[in-house]
């Protein structure tokens, strides 16, 4: 008995060695003391892309610390501009309606069909009649019921991620949708009991955007849209459809200090995502905090204004000089939505090891809203969006000119 146990232990030891050998095969990177010293002198000048900085016995020399802090904060401001683009765009959209329409509120459907009503909306179609609005899940689950028929739509959170399409491209293929939208703070007793035919979706934000396009004649559209129900659980009431009155409301991000004021409003209206806590610290160093008034110092104000300017230049570059290979196509065409995961925008911003940053900034600067069907197109059951900013010779396309697209 003792011998058997001893043999078993020996076999176990061998197995452990075999298992651990691959992990220890890779050597840790090393650096000599001389290499270490050469890269950052104790006393001397450090030459960088952003200029020269002097060290005195390892300390930043007199006056250098202020320059370094300015550099640090300017870099943070420009990256925070890119980070906040989706949230600022969605917040401005909702807030614009709050300011423009006396009767506008959550759970309202805005009837958008005229030129000025869609002029301020990024990438809105010129001829499509839209019905859209915002809901809030903080006090109760958002209930959305869509009748059977020809409709296309989506649900989107405030970071422009989408849990689902609705209508003919949704999971029920136009047979009718009974949606329960739950947010991070929805009370458990304000969520309905599960029911057959009901689809429950969990959002990362309290607020939700919904869009519907009813297809058919004017009479068919009116009949369908009047059957749509939008309300918070336990507070069912008739859904109000509000005429957009040909009013211009912008949903694109404002410029200058107005951008940061809108971002301050946005973060105070929403739940902080775990992935964004470090960015929230950056905002704090620039005078923007959740739960506190927007009161940046004179220095912070200058940095924020400059950061918005540089950040927008970065966003324009991401849009018009695309370097993400996963969305590029032949003859200067590229995918506006979709493309290779990690490079293209999808209905989710999460990949296995990271959340996308540049693709999200690129898309949410030039357009608005995503959905599974728009970003993972399938023949016959989805949509595809491609774009082109240059002609075949590399010349920039101009809005005042006419062009012919030849399909062969």
Which residues does each predicted region cover?
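Bacterial N-terminal signal peptides
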Residues: 10-20
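Bacterial N-terminal signal peptides that target proteins for export
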Residues: 2-11
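Sec/Tat signal peptide C-region and signal peptidase I cleavage site
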Residues: 21-25
């Amino acid at each position: 008995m003792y011998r058997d146990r001893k043999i078993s232990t020996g076999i176990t030891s061998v197995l452990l060695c075999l298992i651990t050998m691959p992990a220890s095969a890779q050597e840790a990177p090393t650096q000599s003391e001389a290499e270490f010293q050469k890269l950052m002198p104790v006393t001397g000048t450090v030459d960088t892309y952003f200029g020269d900085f002097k060290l005195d016995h390892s300390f930043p020399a007199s006056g250098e610390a202020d320059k370094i802090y300015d550099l640090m904060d300017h870099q943070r401001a420009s990256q925070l501009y890119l980070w906040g683009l989706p949230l600022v765009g969605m917040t401005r959209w909702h807030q614009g309606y709050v300011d423009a329409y006396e009767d506008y509120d959550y759970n309202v459907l805005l009837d958008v069909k005229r030129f000025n009503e869609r002029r301020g909306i990024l990438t809105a179609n010129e001829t499509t009649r839209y019905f859209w609005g915002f809901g809030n899940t903080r006090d109760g689950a958002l209930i959305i019921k869509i009748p059977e028929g020809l409709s296309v739509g989506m649900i989107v959170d405030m970071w422009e991620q989408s849990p689902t399409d609705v209508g003919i491209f949704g999971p029920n293929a136009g047979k009718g949708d009974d949606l329960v939208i739950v947010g991070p703070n929805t009370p458990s007793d304000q969520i309905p009991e599960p029911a057959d035919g009901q689809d429950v979706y969990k959002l990362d934000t309290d607020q939700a955007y919904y869009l519907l396009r009813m297809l058919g004649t004017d009479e068919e559209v009116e009949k369908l849209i009047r059957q749509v129900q939008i309300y918070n659980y336990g507070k069912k009431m008739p859904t109000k459809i509000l005429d957009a009155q040909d009013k211009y409301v912008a949903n694109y991000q404002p410029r200058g200090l107005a951008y940061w004021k809108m971002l301050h409003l946005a973060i105070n209206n929403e739940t902080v995502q775990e992935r964004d806590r470090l960015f929230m610290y950056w905002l704090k160093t620039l005078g923007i905090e959740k739960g506190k008034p927007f009161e940046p110092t004179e220095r912070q104000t200058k940095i924020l204004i400059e950061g918005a300017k540089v950040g927008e230049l970065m966003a324009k570059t991401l849009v018009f000089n695309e370097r993400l290979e996963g969305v590029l196509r032949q003859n200067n065409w590229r995918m506006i939505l979709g493309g290779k995961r990690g490079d293209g925008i999808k209905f989710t911003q999460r990949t296995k090891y990271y959340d996308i940053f540049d693709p999200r900034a690129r898309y949410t600067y030039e357009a608005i809203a995503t959905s599974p069907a728009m970003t993972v197109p399938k023949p016959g059951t989805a949509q595809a969006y491609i774009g082109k900013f240059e002609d075949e010779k590399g010349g920039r396309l101009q809005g005042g000119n006419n062009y012919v697209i030849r399909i062969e």
